[in-house]
Structures are given as C-alpha cells and as structure tokens.
Amino acid sequence: MRNALKLNKKNYIDNIHSRSKGWITRSVIDKKGYSQWHYKYAELKDLDMSDENIYITLNTFYKPCRRLENIKELNTLFIDLDYYKTGKTKDQVLMDLEKNYFNQSIPIPNYVIDSGRGMYLIWIINAVPSKALPLWKAVQEYLYNQLKYFGADRQALDATRILRVPGSINSKSKTVVNILDEYEYIYDLREIQNGFLPELKPYERKKGRPSKINYIYRERSLYYGRIQDIIKLCELREYDLKGHRELILFLYRYYLCSFTEDIEKALNDVLELNSMFRQHLSEREVIRATRSAERCYLDKNKQYKYKNETLIELLEITEEEQKYMTIIISKKEYKRRENIRGKKNYQEQLKAKGKATKKEELNVLRKKIKALKEKGFKNKEITLMLEVPIKTLERHITYMKKNGLL
C-alpha cells in the first residue's frame, strides 16, 4: 500500500511540475509551527512526502520566495472543497459533481483528491506567465462561484496557495491524502475561458455599461500591475525607501488584499517586504501604518482609487523609473511607449508588404554611394546616377566619413 502511495505521489508531482522551470515551495506544519523550503523540480521529485502535513505549491516562482509578485508559471487551477461543512458525504458530493457539473458548468478536473477533511479539484493547464494572472484569477473566481454549494473555500483561490500532497498524512483526520480520480488531459487557460466564461471575450461585449465580470477582470489587472510596480520601485531604489515606507507598505497591503482576497497572507507579505527595507519599521509600526488598507478592502463601500498622477507625485517616481513600470506611468511615458509601438507596427507592416524600412533604404543608398566613390565617380556624376540632390549626397558622405563607412 505504501509503495502504491509513493507511486501516486511521484506521478502527481511529475504531471504537475515536470515542465516547471521555476521554484516550487514545499511546506510542513508541525508542533514547531509553519516551515517552508524552495526547490526546483529535479530536487523536489525525490523528496519524501509521506510525513504529516506536507504541502507544495502548484504554481512556481522566479526566486525562492512565495509571494504573488514572484509568480513565474501558472500550471494549475484548483478549488478546495470543505464539503464537511455542507452536511454531505464525500460520495454524495462526487456523484453530484459527476452528474451535474463536470463537463457542463465546469471542466472535468485532472485530479480529485481526498485531502482528509475536504476535497481538492485540480485542473492542469499549459503553463502561462504571470501576465496572465488577472485572467487566471477570473477563472478561479468562476470555478469558486460554481462550487460554493459544495463548500468551496474562498480563502484558497490565490496563485501562491499550498495544497496537501497525495501520500502525506492529514494529522487532523489521521488519514492519508489520496487521489480519488484522474483525468489525463492538459487544458489551455484560454480554452477554459472560451468554453465556460464567454463574458470575458472582448468581441462579445455589448454597448453600454460593461458587464460586472469584465469590470472585475479589469480591476484585478490594475491591482496586479500596481503590485508589480511597487516591488519594481523598491528594487530600483535598492530598498532605500525612507520617506515613503509607510505609503508603499499601505498600498502593497491594499492591492494584495484586493487581488488575492486573502487578508492574512497579505499582511504576512507586507511584513516580509518591510523586512527587506534598509531601514525597516517595527512589526507594530507596519500593522498600524497599514491597518486602514485592510479595513478599506473589507468595507466594499470605500475604496482607494488613486490616479497614476497622484501615485507618481506621492512616491516621487522619476521619468527614468517610470520606464520600468507597468501601470504607474504618466501620460508622457504612455505617449512615449505609444510612439515606440507605432514605429514598430509601421516597420512590421512594411516588412509584411515586402517594402524596405527607412533605415534599410538609407543603408542601400549609402552602399551605392560608397561603391560609386570607390570607382572614382565625382559627386555631380553620382547625383545624376542616383537621382539625389547634391546637398543630400554631401550630407550622406559627411555622415559616412564621420562613422567610418567611407
């Protein structure tokens, strides 16, 4: 039996992480409290996972730090069903799901796992980068809403979540975490979106007020972008944030609460970010300075809707720093990026039509000038042969001599 469980564990980890390039977190909860370590797949797959309360992350991180802004690959979608709160048995829940939900209102999960006191539903997807987090979160939210009836845990929807490993032991229920069912298939995130969340298709939007789900999707994209920008600002300033520490921590906590909907994890991440500051605040100071962020998040009638211009002014973000930002940028920086995109698109259109870009045309002309000069032709003769004005030719010759091209 133990060998079978080991095989189950190995196949499970292989199926989820064999293609992973990032760091995976392994956690243990024991008498000493919570501990966590970070591994690449090659190391993780050989670790013993048969002890009590062993967890791993199903998504991966750029560096060994389990925080939202470090997400590298989104490998799975998952829902934790606390069905024991509904009064239904495990078998009743499974029968209902198979008959009325799977491949109807939700995709068939790749894994149905008995976690000891609940049940995990896990969908394996072709890995997508962190930029897809707002869409990933929208799909998670959809799955949660479909499965609320079965006790779906709203606090288990964030991308950094740890889940129990098959073959490990749940110390509360004194049972082994076990795989109940498997489905061999790898989904695309867009495939699930298109099949089950048609409201998110841009081309299906109707005139007038946007649907609630599209509004939430845009809001989450904003929150996630600002989380990334706050961390980027800390990195650019090498964590020397004196004068802006309280505001940065406040914003970080507010946007984390709003995006992850996990107030406990948000506070822990804020405390961790503070510890990285060159001159960090005490834990009490951090909690006091950011408490209103959590209150505002919980009170849905109050929201901090800062404009980019306001954040740039409050945090004194320079034009150079804005070049590295995703969301918190000025109109001037936005226009600069638009110009770059416009030039790039124009050049791509020229290439698609088989036409040369301005730069390519100049290079061809200068090569012709060089060839004719080397053959001994005079400037007046070259102007006639290439059909260019004498002043234009002289300008090209000056440029070429200055840059060692002639």
Swiss-Prot record:
One of its GO terms (molecular function) is DNA binding. GO terms for biological process: DNA replication. Keywords: DNA replication, DNA-binding, Plasmid. Is involved in replication of pIP404. This is Replication protein. It comes from Clostridium perfringens. The gene is rep.
